[in-house]
Amino acid sequence: HGCIGCGR
């Protein structure tokens, strides 16, 4: 995972 604001 390397995304900010993906719902995680």
From Swiss-Prot:
Domain of life: Eukaryota
Positions where Arginine amide occurs in the chain: R8
Tissue: Expressed by the venom gland.
GO cellular component: extracellular region
Protein name (record): Cryptide Pep-22
Alphabetical keyword list: Amidation, Secreted
Localization terms from the record: Secreted
